[in-house]
């Protein structure tokens, strides 16, 4: 049985090492640790019970051994005794003792078989506890792998957060550079517009002066034309007046001289006006060239203002795009910061749970080491008990053989005694026919009186023992009922704790799924293109799940109720009392 149980445990351990267990949560690991601790307690209790049963069996075997030795001594005494009636009584006692010894041997065999069953059940429980320890080890490794994956996800989220912050800084730098360029271009455009306005004002002033000059030129030209007409009229009059007299000639000469002088003055004035007109024409030509240049400058300024307007509009579009990108990055940054805070809180929780798992792992290692030591000790003890049981069985078999031989001899002696008793009975019947009294020996009289008193005492003692046994049975039933009630309460409490642990595990799984979903959304939003209007990020609501059904847990303890057996009677005292 023990070898098979050990082989099964080795096979299960090898199969468990070959399996790849999935990643589990810390709450499952803690629950498994609690269950393993409970099973360790149950194993220790069952081991203590098996040790007590073993001690009882050893005590019973020692008592049986003593009783067998006493029987052997009594057999020797019976063989050595010389009295025939004493041999008869001792033979009867030996038969009773033999029957009692056989009953005791049957009880001892039952106890030994029960001890073997208890040892096999304890070994099976120990194998199950070792399997639980292996499962705990794999679960702790899975928790460590989960923590490493969470750390990697946190590092990736931190890198994304840094990338978003760097993109925000670069966008702000570009925005500032564009604003600076825009301000510089606006200042240049304003300077150009001021210069052009000044030029336009100067050109308008020159145009007004040219208009004044044109007006003066027109007036001078009208004066010149009038003088020319007057000169023509004067020449006509001079031709008419040539045929008149000398008196009139002198007057005309004088008037002619005056007209000539005025004509010369007019000529000089006209020449000056002509020069002024030429200079005015030159000035007008220069003004026209300047006006053409101003027109060209105005056209070029209009083109430049249109280009600057386009550039400003493009800059406005770029600034709007940058503002939208900044808003998007801000929203992403807020989402990433919220996710990072949640991941950091989860990481702290997982770090705490990992520390608990490490502590429980160390405790499990210590318990495993203690299990191994206890395993070796129990192996040695079981081997010793097996050897002792085999030795005691061989001794019992030898004693039984001796008892069979003694029984055979006693049967022969009984036959002889029966023949003698029949002879005595016949002789006494023959004597009783002649007289009303029967003569018996003093030994027979004393034996019968003692036997009657001892029978009364034994009957009274048996009645008292039966009453005490009934009381003890009632007390044991009460204690058993109390134990069953406490065990039922403990089982209900353990079921409630298991349900709470399952609920916590599902809640932690839902939060982890939500966090993973948010991280995936952030990744998809960062990869997606186009403008996304920033919206306030709401709180994450945990997913409500249905309450788990109450199933009977696989790890419910199996309680071994060891009934109180009747104590092996001390045969030496019984025989001494009977004798």
UniProtKB/Swiss-Prot annotation:
Biological process terms in GO annotation: chloroplast avoidance movement; response to blue light
Keyword set includes Transport: no
Alphabetical UniProt keywords: Coiled coil
Chain segments annotated as coiled-coil in the UniProt record: 90-161, 188-216, 383-419, 481-501
Listed InterPro entries: Web
Superkingdom per UniProt: Eukaryota
Keyword Membrane: no
Pfam families tied to this protein: WEMBL
Summary of the function given for this chain in its UniProt record: Required for the chloroplast avoidance response under high intensity blue light. This avoidance response consists in the relocation of chloroplasts on the anticlinal side of exposed cells.
Protein family membership: Belongs to the WEB family.
Name assigned to this protein: Protein PLASTID MOVEMENT IMPAIRED 15
Annotated source species: Arabidopsis thaliana (Mouse-ear cress)
Gene giving rise to this polypeptide: PMI15
């Amino acid at each position: 049985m023990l070898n098979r149980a050990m082989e099964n445990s080795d096979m299960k351990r090898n199969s468990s090492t070959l399996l790849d267990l999935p990643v589990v949560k810390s709450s499952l690991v803690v629950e498994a640790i609690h269950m393993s601790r409970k099973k360790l307690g149950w194993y220790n209790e069952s081991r203590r019970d098996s040790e007590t049963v073993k001690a009882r069996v050893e005590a019973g075997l020692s008592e049986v051994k003593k009783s067998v030795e006493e029987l052997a001594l009594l057999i020797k005494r019976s063989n050595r005794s010389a009295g025939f009636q004493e041999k008869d009584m001792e033979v009867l006692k030996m038969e009773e003792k033999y029957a009692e010894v056989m009953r005791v041997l049957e009880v001892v065999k039952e106890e030994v078989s029960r001890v073997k069953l208890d040892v096999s059940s304890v070994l099976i429980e120990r194998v199950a506890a070792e399997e639980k320890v292996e499962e705990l080890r794999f679960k702790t490794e899975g928790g460590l792998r989960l923590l490493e994956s969470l750390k990697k996800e946190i590092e990736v989220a931190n890198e994304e957060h840094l990338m978003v912050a760097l993109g925000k800084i670069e966008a702000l730098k570009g925005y500032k550079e564009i604003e600076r360029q825009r301000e510089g271009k606006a200042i240049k455009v304003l300077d150009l517009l001021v210069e052009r306005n000044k030029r336009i004002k100067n050109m308008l002033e020159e145009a007004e002066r040219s208009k004044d000059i044109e007006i003066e030129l027109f007036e001078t030209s009208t004066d010149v034309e009038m003088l020319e007409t007057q000169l023509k009229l004067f020449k006509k009059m001079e031709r008419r007046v040539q045929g008149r007299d000398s008196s009139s000639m002198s007057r005309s000469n004088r008037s002619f001289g005056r007209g000539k002088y005025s004509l010369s003055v007019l000529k000089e004035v006209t020449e000056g006006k002509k020069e002024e007109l030429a200079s005015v024409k030159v000035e007008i030509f220069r003004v026209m060239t300047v006006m053409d240049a101003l027109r060209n400058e105005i056209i070029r300024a209009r083109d430049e203002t249109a280009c600057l307007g386009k550039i400003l509009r493009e800059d406005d579009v770029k600034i709007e795009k940058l503002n939208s990108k900044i808003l998007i990055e801000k929203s992403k940054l807020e989402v990433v910061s919220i996710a990072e805070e949640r991941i950091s809180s989860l990481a702290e929780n997982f770090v705490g749970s990992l520390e608990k798992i490490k502590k429980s792992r160390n405790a499990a290692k210590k318990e495993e080491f203690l299990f191994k030591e206890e395993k070796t000790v129990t192996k040695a003890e079981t081997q010793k008990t097996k050897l002792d049981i085999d030795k005691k069985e061989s001794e019992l078999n030898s004693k039984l053989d001796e008892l069979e031989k003694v029984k055979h001899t006693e049967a022969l002696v009984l036959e002889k005694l029966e023949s003698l008793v029949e002879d005595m009975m016949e002789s006494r019947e023959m004597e009783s026919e002649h007289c009303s009294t029967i003569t018996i020996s003093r030994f027979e009289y004393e034996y019968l009186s003692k036997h009657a008193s001892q029978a009364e005492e034994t009957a009274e003692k048996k009645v008292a023992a039966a009453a005490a046994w009934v009381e003890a049975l009632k007390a044991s039933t009460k204690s058993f009922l109390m134990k069953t009630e406490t065990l039922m309460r403990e089982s209900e409490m353990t079921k409630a704790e298991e349900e709470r642990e399952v609920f916590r595990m599902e809640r932690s799984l839902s939060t982890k799924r939500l966090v993973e979903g948010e991280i995936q959304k952030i990744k998809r939003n960062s990869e997606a293109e186009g403008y996304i209007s920033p919206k306030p990020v709401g709180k994450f609501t945990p997913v409500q799940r249905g309450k788990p059904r109450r199933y009977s847990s696989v790890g419910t303890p199996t309680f071994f109720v060891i009934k109180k057996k009747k104590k092996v009677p001390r045969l030496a005292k019984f025989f001494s009392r009977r004798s």
